[in-house]
């Protein structure tokens, strides 16, 4: 076999006159009678190869038979393309290689789709033939970026004294939150391991063990319904540190992210990042992961309108609800249908209606304007900085409904109005989360992040008096409206950890059975510690400018958690189940 001397995509005019050996795939073959042109592709790019009977007749004969995706080894001489035939769309467009020798290393069937960017092919087909899909340049660029980002993370953390330590993949099931993937133990019949949803407990134990600075780029597993863009197995950048406070972690993580963006995609990220409280995020943006690339802030006007004659506002305000609004600048031209569509849109998030004021130079147009005195109307318009040409939208409801409805309306309007700038990376931290929230279905408190998150020191007394007012030492990093990382300072005292377990409804026996080893470890000199975990797939997706994490994972699952290429999951042999002492009890529908 002819061994490669150069990659296809690296040839330039300075290589003219050199003899080279290339290995790659046939992207396209064109027969121009006396000459055959082959675009040869490898992971670095494409170069044009010319087969001429005058240079080598045998090579020319071989080229007559090659087809798309044949694997070739070619020896030839680099020449400048004749003037006027250069291809400015290729980095190699000033040169071509005249072949003097060729070997067909393998033939190929006609692929089910073209191996090129921008193809309109059903994703199921792409996933079924993932080995072909991954040949496309945009997919290879995404995986190269993933590699560069992972390397940058490792380089940065190594320089700052972190050790990469692996934690177990086969661990204990603690059914809190999402479902575990269970693995039966053949050697311990009737018992199961769980695949980790996160190395959370192990990384805290490593801090107890005195490792001080740990990290891992680690696979995690969650057996959950794959709503939106989720995967049953995903990758985290997992980090934990001892003898630090919240500021230490947040500032170091800003440095790390800035370093990764610079190294992987050449983008300068400004630090420090903006910080806002959870309360401010929910009030102004209707979400705890706001996109700050555009304005459209939400304003609470409850106090202004609680006593107006408009009964909807009055009733909601006096029942403990809120009235919030946002100003859609320059949208006074929206049609009746537009307004009806937006009302239906907020209805998807629980809102019972969408009130509006259309501001024109002459008047305020609105079915609700007649219920307001002139000074009340003026105060309301001023509160939202309204001007002629704007529409002011209002939702009156419970705080959580108003936040969700207007938060989603804000994003919807920004997309529709083209307010979201492309190629901009807007980072922020959301801090001061509540430690707990109340689950009305389960009738108990649940941890907003996880039960190992430490409360603010000054809020410790409130754990007994009013748990919902306790703030957490938690912090989420948000990029362009996507949460890319979440972390906290951890509880490191047994008494506080036991109190936390009790608050979320774990009995003393349950806490001991599930986390007894951890509680015991806390009695042997546990340092103050904290950490963070970044969703690596989502981070790379945003860096690559892609719409789905499936585009930055080599072998992703579908939304029904299947691998179309290998056919997983699959039915296993009875012998295997017998060895594991497992009987399968399928739902009736699946047995038929």
From Swiss-Prot:
- List the residue ranges of the region (Aspartate): 200-203
Return the annotated site residues (Important for tRNA non-discrimination): 32, 84
Disulphide bonds in the chain? none
Residues reported to bind ATP: 222-224, 231, 483, 535-538
Identify the residues that bind L-aspartate: 176, 222, 449, 490
> EC number(s)?
6.1.1.23
Any one GO cellular component localisation term in the record? cytoplasm
At the top level, the lineage of the source is Bacteria
Q: Where would you find this protein in the cell?
A: Cytoplasm
Q: Which GO terms describe its molecular function?
A: aspartate-tRNA ligase activity; aspartate-tRNA(Asn) ligase activity; ATP binding; catalytic activity, acting on a protein; nucleic acid binding; transferase activity
Q: What is its main location?
A: cytoplasm
Which residues, by range, are in coiled-coil regions? none
One biological process GO term for this chain?
aspartyl-tRNA aminoacylation
Q: Name the InterPro entries for this protein.
A: Aa-tRNA-synt_II, aa-tRNA-synth_II, aa-tRNA-synth_II/BPL/LPL, Asp-tRNA-ligase_1, Asp-tRNA-ligase_1_N, Asp/Asn-tRNA-synth_IIb, AspRS_core, GAD-like_sf
Which catalytic reaction applies to this protein? tRNA(Asx) + L-aspartate + ATP = L-aspartyl-tRNA(Asx) + AMP + diphosphate
Do you know which HAMAP family this protein is assigned to? Asp_tRNA_synth_type1 (MF_00044)
- Indicate the family of this protein: Belongs to the class-II aminoacyl-tRNA synthetase family. Type 1 subfamily.
Q: Assembly and interactions?
A: Homodimer.
The protein in question is named Aspartate--tRNA(Asp/Asn) ligase
Q: Which organism is it from?
A: Carboxydothermus hydrogenoformans (strain ATCC BAA-161 / DSM 6008 / Z-2901)
């Amino acid at each position: 076999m002819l061994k490669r001397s150069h990659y296809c995509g690296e040839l330039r005019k300075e290589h003219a006159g050199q003899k080279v050996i290339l290995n790659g795939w046939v992207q396209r073959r064109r027969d121009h009678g006396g000459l055959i042109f082959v675009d040869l592709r490898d992971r670095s790019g494409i170069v044009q190869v010319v087969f001429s009977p005058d240079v080598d007749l045998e090579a020319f004969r071989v080229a007559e038979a090659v087809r798309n995706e044949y694997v070739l080894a070619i020896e030839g001489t680099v020449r400048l393309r004749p003037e006027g035939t250069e291809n400015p769309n290729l980095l190699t467009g000033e040169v071509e290689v005249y072949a003097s020798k060729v070997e067909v290393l393998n033939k190929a069937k006609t692929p089910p789709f073209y191996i090129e960017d921008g193809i309109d092919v059903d994703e199921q087909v792409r996933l079924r033939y993932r080995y072909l899909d991954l040949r496309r340049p945009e997919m290879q660029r995404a995986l190269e970026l993933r590699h560069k980002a992972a390397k940058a993370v490792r380089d940065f953390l190594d320089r700052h004294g972190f050790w990469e330590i692996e934690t177990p993949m086969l661990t204990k099931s603690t059914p809190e939150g999402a479902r575990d993937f269970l693995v039966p133990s053949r050697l311990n019949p009737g018992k199961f391991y769980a695949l980790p949803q996160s190395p959370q407990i192990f990384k805290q134990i490593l801090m107890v063990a005195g490792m001080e600075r740990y990290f891992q780029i680690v696979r995690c597993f969650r057996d959950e319904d794959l709503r939106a863009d989720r995967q049953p197995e995903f990758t985290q950048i997992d980090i934990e540190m001892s003898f630090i406070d919240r500021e230490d972690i947040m500032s170091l993580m800003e440095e790390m992210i800035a370093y990764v963006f610079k190294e992987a995609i050449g983008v300068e990220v400004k630090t420090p990042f903006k910080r806002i409280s959870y309360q401010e995020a929910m009030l102004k943006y209707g979400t705890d992961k706001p996109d700050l690339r555009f304005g459209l802030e939400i304003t609470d006007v409850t106090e202004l309108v609680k006593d107006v004659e408009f009964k909807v506002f009055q009733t909601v305000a006096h029942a403990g609800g809120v009235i919030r609004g946002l100003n859609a600048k320059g949208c006074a031209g929206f049609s009746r249908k537009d307004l009806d569509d937006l009302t239906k849109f907020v209805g998807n998030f629980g809102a019972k209606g969408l009130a509006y004021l259309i501001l024109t130079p002459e008047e305020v147009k609105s079915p609700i304007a007649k219920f307001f005195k002139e000074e009340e109307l003026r105060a309301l318009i001023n509160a939202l900085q309204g001007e002629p040409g704007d529409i002011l939208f209002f939702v009156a409801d419970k705080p959580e409904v108003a936040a969700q409805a207007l938060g989603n309306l804000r994003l919807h309007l920004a997309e529709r109005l083209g307010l979201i700038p492309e190629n901009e990376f807007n980072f922020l931290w959301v801090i001061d989360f509540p430690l707990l929230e109340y689950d009305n279905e389960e009738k108990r408190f649940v941890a907003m992040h996880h039960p190992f998150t430490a409360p603010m020191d000054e809020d410790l007394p409130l754990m007994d008096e009013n748990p919902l007012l306790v703030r957490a030492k938690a912090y989420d990093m948000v990029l362009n409206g996507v949460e890319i990382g979440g972390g906290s300072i951890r509880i490191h005292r047994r008494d506080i950890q036991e109190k936390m377990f009790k608050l979320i409804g774990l009995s003393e026996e349950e806490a001991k059975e599930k986390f007894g080893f951890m509680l015991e470890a806390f009695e042997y000199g546990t340092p103050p510690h904290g950490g963070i975990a970044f969703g690596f797939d989502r981070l790379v997706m945003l860096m690559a400018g892609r719409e789905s994490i499936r585009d930055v994972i080599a072998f992703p699952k579908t939304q029904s958690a299947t691998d179309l290429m290998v056919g997983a999951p699959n039915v296993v042999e009875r012998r295997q189940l017998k060895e594991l002492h497992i009987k399968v009890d399928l739902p009736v529908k699946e047995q038929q």
